[in-house]
Regions:
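Hydrophobic packing positions characteristic
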Residues: 2-167
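Intrinsic-disorder/coil detector with helix-boundary
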Residues: 2-7, 157-200
Length: 200
């Protein structure tokens, strides 16, 4: 059988060749956490989109990506400070894939040579958290406000909200603000001063 019979025109052959090369280059994939190692700060993550492949006979198949293991996680940290989160199984994330092998850098830090020549490989993923699909968003009990900076637990509704109006604390038991706390402290200090005056 001639190649032209299998693939059609030369243009189609080149398009298939380009596509086959692209299958080996990975940029980013949404994933779901399967496990989390808090000591190493790595996760095992399952990609949530299947790869579309075309066999030589023209049959289209969708293939599940393998489990990604030892994926470093990205927490916001700088200058000795870090914002961390309690990652758990089922959390979603976006895994991006490095231009080069990150193994030596991950183990030793500083500037390193790659252990092997590979680009955008599934072995060189880094997980970024915060991405969610619409289905999961629709199931959340509480959503962050669009008018403030918030630290929010979407399951309980507990939150710290910072806006132009001030800082507000919301919990399942009560809601208060910084101004209210200061007022209570001042009132408490006034009571202590009054008692000291009476006793003294």
């Amino acid at each position: 059988m001639q190649i032209s019979e299998l693939y059609g025109s030369d243009n189609e052959l080149y398009q298939r060749l380009i596509s086959s090369i692209g299958f080996g280059i990975h940029v980013a994939l949404p994933c779901v956490v399967q496990s989390y190692d808090a000591d190493k700060q790595t996760i095992e993550a399952q990609p949530t989109i299947r790869e579309r492949t075309i066999e030589l006979n023209g049959i289209v198949k969708y293939v599940q990506y393998p489990l990604l293991i030892n994926v470093p996680i990205l927490f916001q940290q700088v200058g000795g400070y870090i914002i961390s989160f309690p990652i758990k199984k089922g959390d979603e994330c976006l895994v991006i894939f490095s231009d080069l092998s990150i193994d030596n850098w991950w183990l030793k830090g500083n500037v390193q040579n790659p252990v092997e020549i590979r680009r955008h490989d599934l072995s060189d993923g880094i997980a970024i958290f915060g991405l969610k699909n619409q289905e999961k968003l629709s199931l959340e009990k509480t959503k962050p406000s669009a008018n403030c900076l918030s630290l929010l637990n979407t399951e309980t509704g507990n939150a710290i909200e910072i806006s132009e109006e001030g800082i507000k604390f919301n919990t399942t038991k009560y809601t208060t603000t910084i101004d209210s706390i200061v007022a209570r402290l001042n009132n408490h200090e006034e009571r202590i001063a009054a008692l000291e005056e009476i006793v003294g």
